[in-house]
């Protein structure tokens, strides 16, 4: 009977014995394989005497046999003991003498046994949002600005104009790298320049030359400029004002075949806003549930699972780097470790919620989710059919729905309060 020993944390160790006769039988089987293909001078292929095969290939046959026997015996034990393994085990052979029992140790990690607690202590604030006509008006204004043209103006520049400037910056009378440009087009009001720069341009007209005194922020990205006072000599070459398109049928038609009137456009916008709002609210509530679960349930996680998650995050980083997996692989482990650990913890907690509540993906919710996704496309029926025929996509959606149901299970026990909020507060929380 093998005794499983706890070494540290979630690491376990067990000593396993393989009977000598089983080992020798496995070695003989390996030798048969070598005998079939062995080429030895003076003998035909497959006709080499057994003692010569054993002499030449005995060591290799024994290694191959153990490579098969060790994991087989370990996983038989893991199945029998119902071990919830995390990652692959490592083996160390203690005795492998010919004719004797083979004794080896397996070191491995297991997933923790999660016992959910403190659900009633989790506090969740659910925003209650109504999309108003003013919200729709604001969205239409955004669309108009996206389609805007620019007209040259002789008026003084203001915070919503576009200006073309030449500038040359100095610090203590000396020019610095990156501080000079010609025909630089600046969209005012977007905060692209350091504080005080745009404000210094406002009120000036095309053709004017003037100086601006500014100070680089203490956290500026260029080390040599942090916190430094600078003077910029400006030549304002052009001021342009934004010209918004009228809400005509021609303008409305740009936003899809189903938008023929302003009323149609407003309906489409409101529909999209409702979908975006629903996703944002779901995400916000889920994040609060996750934060609450982690605060109430401190659980150890196996290093192997964290390592696997780090590789997933590195892969995602590679996608952001344009598929450069070599560059992503060089990113330090520390960059991903905390996020990876958190993701493993969340996965374990959600897994326990799903298991303890015997949850299964609600197919009606899956269907509704597909229809919601499809409604954003011009041919929703084709999108629905595409999802229904793609098992991988369907399983991904079922997992999303299952997580939503797990969140619902927590909300049923948590302290939930409602708070009225505006559409803009939810969609632009950093604004």
UniProtKB/Swiss-Prot annotation:
Compartment(s) where it occurs, according to its Swiss-Prot or TrEMBL record: Cytoplasm
UniProt GO cellular component terms: cytoplasm
Keywords: Cell cycle, Cell division, Chaperone, Cytoplasm, Isomerase, Rotamase
UniProt-listed Enzyme Commission number(s): 5.2.1.8
GO MF terms, alphabetically ordered: peptidyl-prolyl cis-trans isomerase activity; protein folding chaperone; ribosome binding
SUPFAM superfamilies on file: FKBP-like, Triger factor/SurA peptide-binding domain-like, Trigger factor ribosome-binding domain
Main location: cytoplasm
Domain PPIase FKBP-type: 160-245
Reactions accelerated catalytically: [protein]-peptidylproline (omega=180) = [protein]-peptidylproline (omega=0)
InterPro entries assigned: PPIase_dom_sf (IPR046357), PPIase_FKBP_dom (IPR001179), Trig_fac (IPR005215), Trigger_fac_C (IPR008880), Trigger_fac_C_sf (IPR037041), Trigger_fac_ribosome-bd_bac (IPR008881), Trigger_fac_ribosome-bd_sf (IPR036611), Trigger_fact/SurA_dom_sf (IPR027304)
GO BP, one annotated term: 'de novo' cotranslational protein folding
PANTHER family according to UniProt: TRIGGER FACTOR CHAPERONE AND PEPTIDYL-PROLYL CIS/TRANS ISOMERASE (PTHR30560), TRIGGER FACTOR-LIKE PROTEIN TIG, CHLOROPLASTIC (PTHR30560:SF3)
Similarity comment text for this entry: Belongs to the FKBP-type PPIase family. Tig subfamily.
NCBIfam families: tig
Function description: Involved in protein export. Acts as a chaperone by maintaining the newly synthesized protein in an open conformation. Functions as a peptidyl-prolyl cis-trans isomerase.
Domain comment as written in the entry: Consists of 3 domains; the N-terminus binds the ribosome, the middle domain has PPIase activity, while the C-terminus has intrinsic chaperone activity on its own.
Protein name: Trigger factor
Organism the protein comes from: Actinobacillus succinogenes (strain ATCC 55618 / DSM 22257 / CCUG 43843 / 130Z)
């Amino acid at each position: 009977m093998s005794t499983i020993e706890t070494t540290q944390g979630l690491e376990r160790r067990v000593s396993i014995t393989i009977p000598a006769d089983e080992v020798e039988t496995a070695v003989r089987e390996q030798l048969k394989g070598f005998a079939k293909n062995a080429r030895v001078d003076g003998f035909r292929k497959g006709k080499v005497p057994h003692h010569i095969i054993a002499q030449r290939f005995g060591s290799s046959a024994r290694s191959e046999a153990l490579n098969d026997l060790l994991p087989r015996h370990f996983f038989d034990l893991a199945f029998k003991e119902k071990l919830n393994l995390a990652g692959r085990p490592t083996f160390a052979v203690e005795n492998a003498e010919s004719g004797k029992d083979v004794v080896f140790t397996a070191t491995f990690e297991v997933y923790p046994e999660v016992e959910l607690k403190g659900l009633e202590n989790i506090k969740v604030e659910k925003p209650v949002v109504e999309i108003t006509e003013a919200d729709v008006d604001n969205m239409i204004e955004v669309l108009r600005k996206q389609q805007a043209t620019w007209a040259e103006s002789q008026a003084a520049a203001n915070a919503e104009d576009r200006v073309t400037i030449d500038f040359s910056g100095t610090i203590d009378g000396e020019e610095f790298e990156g501080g000079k440009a010609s025909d630089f087009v600046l969209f005012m009001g977007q905060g692209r320049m350091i504080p005080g720069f745009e404000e210094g341009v406002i009120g000036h007209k095309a053709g004017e030359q003037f100086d601006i005194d500014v100070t680089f922020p203490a956290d500026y990205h260029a080390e040599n400029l942090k916190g430094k006072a600078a003077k910029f000599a400006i030549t304002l070459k052009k001021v342009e004002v934004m010209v918004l398109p009228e809400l005509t049928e021609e303008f409305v038609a740009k936003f899809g075949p189903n938008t023929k009137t302003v009323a149609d456009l407003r309906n489409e916008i409101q529909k999209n806003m409702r979908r975006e709002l629903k996703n944002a609210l779901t995400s916000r509530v889920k994040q609060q549930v996750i934060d609450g679960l982690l605060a109430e349930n401190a659980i150890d996680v196996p290093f192997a699972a964290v390592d696997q998650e780090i590789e997933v995050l590195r892969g995602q980083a590679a996608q952001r780097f344009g598929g450069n997996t070599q560059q992503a692989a060089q990113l330090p482990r520390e960059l991903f470790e905390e996020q990876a650990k958190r993701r493993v913890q969340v996965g374990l907690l959600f897994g326990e919620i799903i298991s303890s509540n015997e949850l299964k993906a609600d197919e009606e919710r899956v269907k509704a989710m597909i229809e919601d996704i499809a409604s954003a496309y011009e041919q929703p029926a084709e999108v629905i059919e595409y999802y229904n025929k793609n098992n991988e996509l369907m399983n991904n959606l079922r997992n999303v729905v299952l997580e939503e149901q797990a969140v619902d299970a927590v909300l049923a026990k948590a302290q939930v309060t409602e708070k009225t909020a505006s559409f803009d507060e939810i969609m632009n929380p950093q604004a």
